[in-house]
């Protein structure tokens, strides 16, 4: 069905299965296990003003019954809700309605509340060649400053290096001081011909690459940023300290941090824990346990120190970085780290 998710329901006789996924409804005969499309036509009339009024009432009741502080942070919820309700008749779209919800809920002065409108508007997607270019370059084409690791040009056959000029994309020349990204519109995952020039040797050549989408690009740039942070800490500490970044307060990030501090950084004297720009999750207890180890035993095998105990927690000094862009549990985790006196907290 090529759908991101699907729902299923069985008929009362248990002979057929109805599957709804994407924009299609299908029926499966369980005896033959074959899917057959179900064609239908339906119309629905929506009273959007009434729908928004219902949602307003729902928000009012949810906050009244479930807000964590029974005093509602000192806000008279009935009076405040009545003041905002009067704007409802004058709202005719969900964008403005989301703004109304955000302003209204903002009166409670608490995080994790608000309204958001996300319209589904199919748009063009600009691909990337996975390179960083020199914005000060004034000639034809684009001058490459750096090819991003694991990007489209990062392979053994490519001759691209710093200083290489991108002259053409799919045969189209790039005029001076022109944003070449317009030539990459809708080119993600599609073979693309790139004409290149080495101004030092005078060589011109072509390479076929497969541009990447923004999601992959952002992930590669993130890894580049973390790698640079680790290199800086390694340089500034003369190899005495390690560096890890907690991308999100979830299982994947925890496993990555755990692997690094007890793996390649196991013999370092200390660790820098970077939580900046983390969007949250729930990891504060795991981080507290991981970085609160206190050495109580050293295992010696044949006269050589083999490991310290506990061997599955960090027993050495650490320091944690935070910033104003941290959200949710990425704010709570640094608080726990500081409150438990696990180490110094640096940042706002």
Question: What do the predicted segments below correspond to?
Answer:
Residues 2-18, 153:
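Conserved beta-propeller blade repeats
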Residues 18-23, 197-198:
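Beta-strand C-termini and the immediately following turn/loop, strongest in propeller blades
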Residues 22-31:
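Structural motif
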Residues 30-108, 112-114, 138, 142:
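Terminal targeting/pro-maturation regions of precursor/exported proteins
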Residues 64-66, 167, 172-348:
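Cleft-lining beta-strand/loop regions that shape enzyme active-site pockets
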Residues 70-78, 98-101, 113-123, 159, ...:
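Short coil/turn segments at secondary-structure boundaries
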Residues 88-140, 202-228:
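Extended, small/polar residue-biased N-terminal targeting/export presequences
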Residues 124-177, 251, 327:
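PDZ/PDZ-like domain segments forming the peptide/carboxylate-binding groove
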């Amino acid at each position: 069905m090529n759908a991101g998710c699907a729902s299923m329901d069985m008929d009362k006789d248990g002979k057929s299965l109805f599957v709804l996924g994407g924009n299609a409804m299908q029926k499966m005969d369980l005896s033959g296990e074959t899917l057959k499309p179900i064609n239908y036509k339906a119309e629905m009339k929506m009273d959007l003003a009434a729908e928004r009024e219902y949602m307003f009432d729902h928000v009012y009741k949810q906050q009244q019954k479930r807000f964590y502080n029974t005093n509602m942070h000192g806000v008279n919820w009935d009076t405040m809700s009545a003041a905002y309700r009067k704007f409802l008749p004058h709202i005719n779209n969900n964008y403005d309605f989301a703004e109304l919800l955000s302003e209204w809920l903002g009166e409670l002065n608490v995080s994790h509340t608000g309204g958001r409108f996300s319209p589904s508007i199919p748009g063009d997607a600009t691909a990337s060649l996975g390179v960083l270019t020199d914005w000060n370059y004034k000639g034809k084409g684009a001058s490459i400053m750096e090819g991003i690791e694991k990007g489209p040009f990062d392979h053994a056959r490519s001759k691209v290096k710093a200083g290489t000029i991108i002259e053409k994309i799919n045969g189209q020349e790039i005029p001076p001081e022109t944003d070449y990204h317009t030539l990459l519109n809708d080119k993600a995952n599609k073979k693309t011909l790139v004409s290149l020039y080495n101004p030092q040797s005078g060589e011109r050549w072509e390479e076929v690459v497969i541009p990447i989408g923004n999601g992959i690009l952002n992930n590669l740039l993130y890894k580049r940023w973390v790698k640079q942070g680790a290199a800086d800490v390694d340089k500034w500490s003369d190899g005495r300290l390690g560096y890890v970044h907690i991308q999100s307060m979830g299982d994947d990030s925890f496993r990555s941090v755990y692997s690094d501090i007890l793996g390649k950084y196991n013999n370092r004297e200390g660790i820098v824990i970077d939580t900046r720009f983390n969007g949250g999750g729930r990891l504060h207890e795991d981080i507290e346990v991981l970085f609160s180890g206190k050495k109580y035993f050293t295992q010696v095998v044949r006269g050589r120190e083999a490991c310290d105990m506990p061997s599955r927690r960090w027993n050495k000094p650490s320091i944690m970085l935070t910033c104003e862009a941290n959200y949710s549990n990425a704010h709570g985790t640094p608080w726990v780290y500081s409150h438990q006196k696990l180490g110094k907290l640096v940042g706002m």
